[in-house]
Amino acid sequence: MADASDPEDNMQYFLIFTLLWAASSNARDWRTPDEAQVTLEYIAHAAFRLVGSQGTSLLVDPYQSRWWIGYDFPSGLPASDAVLLSHPHPDHDAGYARGATPPWSADTRIIDGPGDYTVGAFSIRGIRGRHAEPYGEEFGRINTIWRIEVAGLRVVHIGDNEPLNAAVAAEIGDVDVIMLPVDDEEHILSFEEVERYRRRLKPLVVVPMHYRHDDLESDPDRPGDLGSVDGWFARQPDGRQLGTHTISLSRSALKELPGVWVLEHSPLVTRAE
């Protein structure tokens, strides 16, 4: 993967990132004091954990082990208070809709559709979207975009949503951090469609997801229609490889380090053999 990071040692990115938003006539009313923090953890594929400062946690779009992608979902993750599932493909719901044993406990709250939800300090809006073509016809191409507000930040995970339209953009609103599916095979979104999300929503940070991890795949031809993120990332003048799978976010300095952040996958995810 191309290294577009600053020359300083990658360990600097373990520092807490914070977000400062200039006062304006449309200042965001969900802002909270600078001391509030949230931890973002990339697991692999399109799966993330968000952990609030009080310990409440969300698991977003966990994948089913060795379904399409060739590696396992890690068994050593801490329990989450709720799991958000954007759509019923097994690489986004861990096979839950098909009766697979999920990687979360029986008492975990499952949120899998549009609506407004509260989980601890997290305010969540599920926005009705549509799965990118030509996939998902078997379940009506449903896809829920997750807009998550916590610690003065708005974090958006689009699942496998189609190209952005005006109605969805208006409901998403302002964005601080967005997770977008991007890979060199343009499996879900074309590069231009990814840029349309960036231009319209103007997130401070883009975190790419839903791409091939070569170090985890034992079969060079599997999955055949999912590329790495390397080529796209090499084109990003504001790209940074953070050298970590977990970062802490707060609101007072995030815009000092805007752009594309490529996170490592969790070390708990091991190569398929």
Question: What is each residue range found by the language model?
Answer:
Residues 80, 176-177, 194-211:
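Proline-aspartate-enriched helix->loop->beta-strand connector
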Residues 65-69, 88-94, 163-166, 185-190, ...:
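Active-site environment of divalent metal-dependent phosphoester hydrolases
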Residues 2-10:
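Short, Lys/Arg-enriched N-terminal segments with co-localized hydrophobic residues
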Residues 140-141, 190-196, 225:
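Charged helix-capping and loop-helix junction motifs
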Residues 20, 24-82, 106-173, 177, ...:
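Core dinuclear metal-dependent hydrolase active-site scaffold
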Residues 80-90:
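Metallo-beta-lactamase
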Residues 41, 205-273:
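Binuclear metal-ion centers of metallo-dependent hydrolases, dominated by the metallo-beta-lactamase
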Residues 13-21:
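Bacterial N-terminal signal peptides
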